[in-house]
Design a protein with these regions (language model features):
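Bacterial N-terminal signal peptides that target proteins for export
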Residues: 2-15
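Short, linear, compositionally biased motifs with a strong N-terminal bias
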Residues: 20-21
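C-terminal motif of bacterial Sec signal peptides marking the signal peptidase cleavage site
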Residues: 24-25
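Cell wall/extracellular polymer interaction/catalysis modules
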Residues: 28-215, 224-270
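Residues that recognize and position ribonucleotide moieties
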Residues: 218
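Conserved "landmark" site that anchors the functional core of diverse proteins
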Residues: 221
């Protein structure tokens, strides 16, 4: 996740602690770890059949007056990483099972993540999220050894040398033959501390096609993305959750996730 706009400092602090504990080799995970997303009022949930599935289903939820999750709108198909999913670095505690997201592995990060800034090709967008219209000089740095790793930068500010080796121009329509996948989207705040080689530049964005997976992002129909951006509000502290079905069933109670998405990810609606 690029670091140009992160969620509240309290969330970043807890996420940092989780990363440092993992890097220190901590083997003990509390039975009921802190949930920095407990105050989230909006939640985007993506469930996939298993760790290797490259497509799944997206649902949106908001809390009612009683604090319960209620689905908003309809379920939509999505594509994720070409190699499936792997645990990412987000708001959730480290998990003992399953693959781990690494730079260039083609997996989408699994877990609970803050939703960051929206972006797109146009100067403005119909969203309450902070929004940045991208220019030809904007890149997301996916070079693990760069001091700008996992950040969206402007070459007019950092210089051309700073983006050497990056494969993530934010104006794909200009640099990649008219590609519309980044026409509109938002940042999924994976790896906020920019741990080298842990994965970078994770977005929710428009898909190339319903059957074309991504390098690690979550992609969907443009109309679905537009509805999401029109609905999301920064004051609701929205979060993005991606889990394989088995892990969702296991964690939805302990993690206080919506409880009515079970069993719906196996039908291929592409």
């Amino acid at each position: 996740m690029p670091a140009f706009n992160s969620i509240a400092g309290r969330i970043r602090h807890v996420a940092c602690i989780a990363v440092l504990l993992a890097l220190a080799g901590c083997a003990h995970v509390p039975a009921n770890p802190p949930q920095p997303w407990r105050d989230a009022g909006q939640l985007v949930l993506v469930t996939v059949a298993d760790w290797n599935a490259d497509h799944g289903q997206l649902r949106s939820f908001e809390r009612d007056d009683a604090g319960q999750w209620v689905q908003v709108g309809t379920t939509a198909p999505v594509v994720i990483g070409r190699a499936g999913a792997g645990w990412g670095l987000g708001l959730h505690p480290m998990q003992p099972d399953g693959p781990t997201k690494q730079e260039g592995d083609g997996r989408a990060p699994a877990g609970v993540f803050a939703i960051g800034q929206a972006f797109g090709y146009a100067p403005h967008a119909a969203t309450a999220l902070p929004y940045t219209g991208m220019d030809a000089g904007d890149y997301c740095i996916d070079v693990s050894t760069s001091p700008l790793y996992n950040r969206i930068v402007d070459t007019a500010v950092v210089g051309e040398a700073a983006i050497e080796g990056s494969t993530e121009p934010m104006r794909r329509d200009i640099h990649a033959g008219g590609d519309q996948r980044y026409r509109i989207g938002f940042v999924v705040e994976h790896n906020p501390q920019a741990v080298p080689a842990a994965g970078s530049c994770i977005f929710a964005h428009v898909w190339k096609s319903p059957t074309t997976p991504t390098a690690g992002c979550t992609a969907m129909d443009a109309a679905v993305m537009e509805r999401l951006l029109a609905w999301l509000r920064p004051d609701a502290d929205p979060v993005f959750v991606l889990l394989p079905q088995a892990q969702y069933l296991q964690l939805r109670g302990p993690w206080a996730l919506p409880g009515d998405a079970a069993g719906a990810t196996h039908a291929d609606s592409r």
